[in-house]
Amino acid sequence: SDLMICRYSYNYDEITQITPEPLYWESFNLAGDDLLKEIIQQIIIEGTVSNEQDRDCSGVIENHARQLGIPEVAKKLNGFFGKDSNNIGFKGKLMRINFINQIAIPIALRYMGHANKEGDLYLSFSDLFTTNPPGKELLDYFENHFGFRFEDIRWKLSPSKVNEITQSVFSKLVGQISGLVGLYNCDIVILSGKICSFQSLENLFLKYHPVTPNRLINLNNYWIGRWFPFADNNGYITDSKTVVAVGSLISYMGGTAHKLDRFKINNQHLCLKLVSTADYIGPVKQGVIQDVVLHAKNSDGTLIAHTLPFQIGFKNIDSIHYPSRNIYAIDFNDQKIIETLTRKGTTDASRLNDAVEAFKHKIRSRMPLKFTISREFDKDKELVVISEVTDNEQDDISKSYFELHTQTLPETTGYWLDSGEFTLNIRN
């Protein structure tokens, strides 16, 4: 999710010229995919039925299995959706990914599509998959694993359940954004993007009250006119993702090509002032940087790594409460280690992998390692290099054995949409 706060000025002398000046800009690692993940986990996979409203829309698979008296439900759920273990083979991982793509995501999108409507809607498997049904092999694998047919499950599309999850996912972020909007005394707030089409999310902004309701504009239901290339016959935007593309085109036509009649956009400030927000860099864990290592007045710093890979993040403001994002990871440089072993005479391909692992093991036995990293703040905030490495006895280790590579995802194993993994709440 992106936030931009601008000051706008304009001049009118036969030609109207608008000049946006960016005051604050930031991206946050929370968006529609995170909501999708929570809906899949809380509605489709696992959850408790605390009242009648939760029935058929909370942990549907788990509760359907419990109603049937299926033994070891938690074990079965973790064996299918949980983090990879030695018990999940290649086929299990493949079926898990297929389940997410063929079943979970389509069902979650149906729930999200019903979120702004009134009343619950009960659907069967055939109602959900009128087209593009999941493959028979996947459905058979599901039955073999859980002990019942997925097609027998009944689903209740509950707007209140989806809106409850939406507010729990975005409440903290909307509160922080509203605080920033209030700090800058913004006159108008514009919401865009598919995720803002949820009325519950718009209600969160109204709850935190960054501006008066009439100054909160949601482009998902804003009449823009039929001139917009992606508007419907009534002049409303059909796909909110097109707003950025069309806005960029208008900026180019009015600011560079000068092809808009008596209208210009002076984008000079946007070109000069929009720079990286990686002002503070340090070790990151669960989106939080406790100790800042590099900042504007400190071009060198040290990191203590007890394990590799080691995650490094950045943030715009030096506050423990300010959201941080991953940017780099320190890990072994396998290529350099192979080159070192080859020079020492290890050339047998069958032995090389074992030699590399043995080499890494020797380095790990000297942990914790102290990495000295540096950058030139004024030249490039994000260009960080490893300048020195020492072990737990202050002996030097060649820095060439390590690499600092881009790692913007918190999980080094990959994104959840690619792996299908979930961290489940284990219950007996």
Give a label for each model feature.
Residues 1, 186-205:
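Glycine-rich phosphate-binding loops at beta-strand->alpha-helix junctions
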Residues 4-145, 257-344, 382-384:
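Phosphate-binding glycine-rich/basic clefts of nucleotide- and phosphate-handling proteins
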Residues 4-8, 192-194, 219:
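Generic beta-strand/beta-sheet core signal
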Residues 19, 134-138, 146-162, 213-238:
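Surface-exposed intrinsically disordered loops and tails
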Residues 33-41, 168, 217-277, 419:
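Glycine-rich phosphate-binding/hydrolytic loop that grips phosphoryl groups
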Residues 140-186, 201-204, 251:
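Phosphate/ATP-binding catalytic cores across multiple sugar-kinase/actin-like superfamilies
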Residues 200-219:
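Short acidic, glycine/proline-enriched helix-loop-strand junctions
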Residues 291-428:
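Long C-terminal appendages of very large multidomain proteins
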